[in-house]
Amino acid sequence: MTPELEFVFELRCQVGPPLDLGPIPAGRRRIVPILGGTFEGSGLKGRVLPGGADWQIVRADGLGELDTRYTLETDDGKLIYVQNAGIRHASPEVTAKLMKGEPVDPSLVYFRTVPKFESSAPELAWLMRSIFVGTGERYPADVVIRFWKLQ
């Protein structure tokens, strides 16, 4: 059986300037604060709460290992914790622009994630019973991620 993907929702969040901790043995540690945002899709709509971040490592080969954690709040007040692991890579020229916060064409960047969702709301339990993937786009002050459920 060939797996299929079902679109679930699109998330748009604003991010602050990265905190660059500098080189560590695994690469360059950067912490990108999440300032807030919105999400909307099939039966889900709400906001991205401020206070999350992406604790990323940029390896020597330019690949970014992403470890993003944040909280969503639905329009009816339900909370969803998100832990989103992923990778992002591009050519050295495009990666250099990304690191400087310059705009790049999203089609030149491979940006994929595998999120895990947690919620105590019974009507959102399905989020914890499926596998999801995300496709991302990075802009100077924003990130857009589209989440898909693996059927």
What residue spans do the PLM features occupy?
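Beta-strand-enriched cores of mature, soluble protein domains
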Residues: 1-151
